[in-house]
Every structure is written in structure tokens, then in C-alpha cells.
Amino acid sequence: TTEKGYLAVASNKGDIRMFDRLGINAKTHIPALGEPIIGLDVSADGRWVLATCRTYLLLIDSLQKEGKNEGKLGFERAFAKDSKPQPRRLGLQPAHVAQFQHETKQPLSFTTARFNTGIDSTETSIVTSTGPFIITWSMKKVIANRKDPYTIKRYGENVMADNFRFGSDKNVIVALPNEVNMVAKRTFQKPTRESIAGPATPKRARSGWSSRLGKDDIVNSPY
């Protein structure tokens, strides 16, 4: 919901509906684009809708930029049939997906993505996780179509839940299987083979085994 009480509802079929209040038909309906939607978040002002699918995120701009409803949100007035918003797909680069899966031996599976929130604060970042990795996207870089919009941090255990500290996008609250931590976003790194592999453990050092993806390795990638 937004700060004005507008509602966004998603289904396991993958479609999204926007309402300005309960008990009426949706003002805007965005048809299914692929996978089921497993989580949904909305910016406080209602401008942005963030949908989580298993292997990617969808960022939707609900502000109407033309026509008779110019300046209105999709929650307030219906989009014209030929001008419905086109979601931005936020995903990991195929090489990073392959390295993630090589490290975890598990398929990509995002937890519900969230905006940073706070009183009178603007959404500037997005956070989600998959396995032992936390990923944050910069809204500014996403909107500018930058090629490097996300950074990562790896843990030794799977991340159970994550969210930004209220009122700031500088710290992320991380729930692990047996503890809850707060980590500074500045410790996140650009995804590289080294940052995805994480620090070497004594076991790895003794065995001489490398977790880096080799040229002869075969991975099961959805791409």
C-alpha cells in the first residue's frame, strides 16, 4: 500500500491490479508477463510498484505521462489501452547467475524485494536475496539504464530475510538461520568472480579446491 492507502495486488498468474480503495474494480490492470509474482512492494508516493518473481524483479512506473490523465497515477485513473506502463525487468547478468549457481548448487530464487522506507524519505534502493547472497539495486542507475545497477554481499549461510533499516538506505537488516545482523551497504561489492566466491575458508585452502567457475565447467543456467 501507499501512504494514501492505494493498493497493488498481484496474483500467482503474474498479473498486477492497482486500486485506489477496496471494494471497487481496479483502476489499472497489467497483464501477466511471465512467471508468478511471489512478492510486491510499492513506494510511499505510489509512483513505483516492485514485483518479485523467482528469477527477476519487475519495476513499474505508475505515473501517466500523456493523455487526459497525464500526471495521475495508475492507482487514481486508468491508463489508456495503448499506453499501459512497460515494466523494467531487473535481473542478474547471465555470467553472475552461472557463478551463483556454481557456488550454491541451487537455482536462483529471490526473496521478496523491498524499497528502502522511512518518514519523508525517497526510495533510492531495492534489496532482495537468493541463497547466501544479498543484492541491492540503485534506483538511480536502474532508471538511467546503467549496465552495473546492482551490488552484492555474500554470507556463509542462506539469508532467510532482509530489509533496509527504517529511514535509511545505508544499512540492511539481515536474518540468517541463527542470528540477525545489520550490515552497512557500503560493504557491498560489484559482482565479480572473487566477490561471488567469497573469502576462502580453511577447508578450501587445504584442499586447494577453487570455487571459481572454470572454462570446462558446465552449469545449469536458466538463460
Which ranges hold each PLM region?
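Short coil/turn segments within WD40 beta-propeller repeats
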Residues: 13-16, 55-57, 132-134, 178-180
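Blade-level signature of beta-propeller repeat domains, shared across WD40, Kelch, NHL, RCC1
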Residues: 57-63, 161-222
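Long, low-complexity intrinsically disordered regions enriched in Ser/Thr/Pro/Gly
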Residues: 65-68, 103-121, 127, 135-137, ...
